[in-house]
Amino acid sequence: YENSPLEKVIKQHNPGRVWRENGRSLKIDEYVNIAGNDTLGCFGFQLINGAREALNISVSKQYENGSLLVTRSEDEDGVTLFEFKDRLERTVLERRIESRLKGDKQLSDTYYIYDDLGKLCAVLPPALSDQLSVGNIPAEKLDMYGYLYKYDVAGNLMAKKLPGISWEYYVYNVNNNLIFSQNGEERKRGEWKFSIPDAFGRVCLQGVCKVAIDPFDNPYLKPIFSGLSNWYVCQYVGSTEYGGYQFSGSLMAGLVGPKPLVQVINYYDNYDFMYRTDLSARDEFRYTHEEGFAATSSSAKGMLTGIAKLHTDAYDQYRNGEYGVDSPYNYSVMYYDDRGRLSQTVSDNHLGGMDRDFFSYDFNGNALRHLHRQTGAGNEILSDSYTYEYDHAERLVKALHRLGDAQEVILIDNVYDDLGRLSRKTFHNGLLNTSYSYNIRSWLTGITGSSFEQVLHYTDGTGIPYYNGNISSMVWKSGEDDIMRGYHFTYDNLNRLTNAVYGEGSVLVQNQNRFNEQVTGYDKM
């Protein structure tokens, strides 16, 4: 600990004798920024939120001495991160030292820029940070390299620009529910994705529409200031063409072109939709009790009770102007027990038949049994069932499967060690066994099976030892081949892989360099 009443941690030794013997630990130091210093200096920025997508960012002089807290953290292999925080504890800079060439440090800086309300408005990656100088940052550079964000009056993310793609827009209602979104490709087609909630914020309708919306002048937020009671949601009334839902107020007032393409319809709280949709004459969607499985509750308040999904070819019809509101849906109905757990689902399938699933649980809610029964158009019934077993810590130890009337098969049989780690897995009645080994830090060190064997080395083996979790070398053999094959790995100062050198034999010195991989460089995004 630090030699002060604050008792801050300055060094941390994690488990492992080899780390202790080699003096490998995590180190934490704290400094303040120093203007003009190549390691502890940090640029300041001025941000002006312009009209629409415009973001004007200029580089001002560096922060005054002592105005930022700098935390230097170093892992067990000396890889270092400097994190600069302002007085509001916001991270304004993350600095990594990539290399030192001829006495000059090659820095990898990521700057974070906030507005007056503390919202993150821009992230400048190292590719852009390397080009910074005092003055305005050219708009074309921000457009090419910057991660840019703009917010509406309610503080919701309204527009986002990532490198290499167009702006993405987001539109919210007065409850801060996302109701419309659009990416660059959708903008070319004049389309918006919509996700309309009910009064409780639960998504009821999802799909695509062509509607005239300006995300920078969001009409759906105006009730916040005008005192109107229109929340711009949808409500189930049971008699409209949108799966029984009705849009509130002027939610689709800016609609242009065809009617909205509703791709997903969600129903909640009850099963009234079954009597007012295509399901009204289909008794096969009704609840059917199955002995040994959970019974349904008389109330489904607050639960998702039904889903209707439009056939996948409807979107192509919509784009070609051929879509009609009578396009077919596939339905699923969900039933729950008195503890709100899924007890039964009923769905129609692409074969013209039905799928029905039954579930049962233990006291803690772990699934014990699952029965799946499918019928095709010819009323042929296929069924398969699953049974699950758990240990005292509620870890899955066995999963069994039965297809029709065939003999039950043990799909998986898991064994755990005293630390709760998976140590052995057996498949299909013991036909295939796989064992796993770990080091003191629970890093995977070996996989041993009947057809494959692999060993991972971190601090041991024949390669350069790494103590921070990077793999130093690995060897493997497969099938009946007794030849051990493997790679030695090396990394740069940012923990990025630079070389993978191939070899064979127990120490990888035979047939070297046959399948080497060399990374000559990384971008700085």
Show where each model-derived region lies.
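Beta-strand elements of repeat-based all-beta scaffolds
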Residues: Y1-T490, R496-K524
